[in-house]
């Protein structure tokens, strides 16, 4: 006997997302869980449980694309270089084992990250203080930095593909990302085309 209201049947139908098809409409959006790069086995098991429970798409938390986007004490995902691929591949394997798609959210924090771990000076569209509790100044990006920024995203997307992710997207919201900083007059005081 079906106890479900038929008006919700669409939730259980497949949906195409670009070149891939999710088996239903249950999409676990990116969220941090405190495991990230520090506990890849636990992260893979937790995301695998979601896939086993029926979610069609299971995503990472935000995944930093470069050491100059180090979110310090937050244990988020990292895809700084090829050495980070095996840890993320554990998650995709666990998710795929249950027939779900694996998604990854690429991010560069720009001025939002004081880079307490990497100690690399933060970058931003314009020179700006990082925040009130970290006495760090982000330096204004040059045009060469902007070209590198685009290159870092391409490299991270290729690494994500190598880790067997099905969906790759870029986090550009909540005033926490370099892309958002370029879009906001609050952070972007440039007078050139950027």
Annotated model-derived regions:
Residues 1-27, 95:
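N-terminal amphipathic alpha-helix/helix-capping segment at the start of soluble metabolic enzymes
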């Amino acid at each position: 006997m079906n106890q479900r209201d038929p008006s919700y049947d669409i939730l259980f139908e497949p949906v195409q997302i670009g070149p891939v098809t999710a088996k239903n409409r249950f999409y676990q959006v990116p969220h941090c869980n405190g495991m990230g790069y520090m506990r890849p086995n636990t992260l893979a098991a937790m995301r695998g449980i979601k896939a086993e429970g029926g979610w069609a798409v299971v995503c990472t938390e935000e995944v930093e694309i470069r050491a100059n986007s180090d979110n310090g004490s937050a244990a988020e995902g990292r895809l700084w270089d090829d050495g980070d691929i095996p840890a993320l591949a554990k998650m995709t394997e666990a998710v795929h084992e249950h027939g779900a798609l694996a998604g990854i959210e690429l991010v560069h924090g720009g001025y939002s990250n004081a880079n307490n771990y990497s100690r690399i000076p933060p970058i931003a569209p314009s020179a700006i203080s990082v925040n009130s509790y970290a006495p760090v100044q982000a330096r204004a990006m040059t045009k060469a930095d902007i070209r590198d920024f685009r290159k870092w995203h391409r490299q991270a997307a290729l690494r994500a593909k190598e880790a067997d992710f099905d969906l790759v997207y870029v986090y550009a919201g909540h005033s926490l990302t370099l892309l958002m900083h370029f879009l906001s007059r609050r952070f972007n005081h440039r007078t050139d085309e950027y």
